[in-house]
Amino acid sequence: NPYFGFGLIDARLATLIAKQWRTLPPFQQCVYDVIPRHISPRFIAPGEKSVISFYANGCRNKPNELSFIEHVEVVLTIRTAFRGDLKLTLVSPMKTNSTLLHYRSKDASNTPLKNWPFMTTHFWGENPRGKWILEISCRNRRLK
């Protein structure tokens, strides 16, 4: 945190806690291809948004079944006139919101984001099963 320090560390207490620490289970990965590649691109007009919802089951009954989340990664290909006009928000089944990409007023690039990974840890510990929502918003620069 840039505003607050963390004080002095009690090395003895830290060592005692470390000896009792329970480790996490091995890393598991569960992948969903939400929008098949053969679907036509979606057009989002300035000032509007596109909402993509999908259901995840956490790879239930598979060797890589998940019961809680550590991080989520969304990989997208997006073409736009102004990249800075885009905002991406992911909403979990528990209604936690995570902004994956904020509006950026100084980003006027039109270079596409091709297979671009957006990662978040805001859903840490949540159950992955249920309805997920990805909102892609496009603001209208002229309305600033």
Residue ranges and their predicted role:
Residues 135-143:
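Short beta-strand-plus-loop segments that form exposed binding edges in beta-rich domains
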Residues 124-130:
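Short glycine/proline/serine/threonine-rich loop/turn segments at secondary-structure transition edges
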Residues 77-81, 93, 139:
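Short solvent-exposed strand-capping/beta-turn motif centered on an Asx-Ser/Thr pair
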Residues 108-119:
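Aromatic sugar-binding surface patches on proteins
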Residues 40-42, 121-124:
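Beta-strand-rich interaction surfaces with strong enrichment in secreted/lumenal proteins
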Residues 87-91:
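Beta-strand signatures of extracellular beta-sandwich domains
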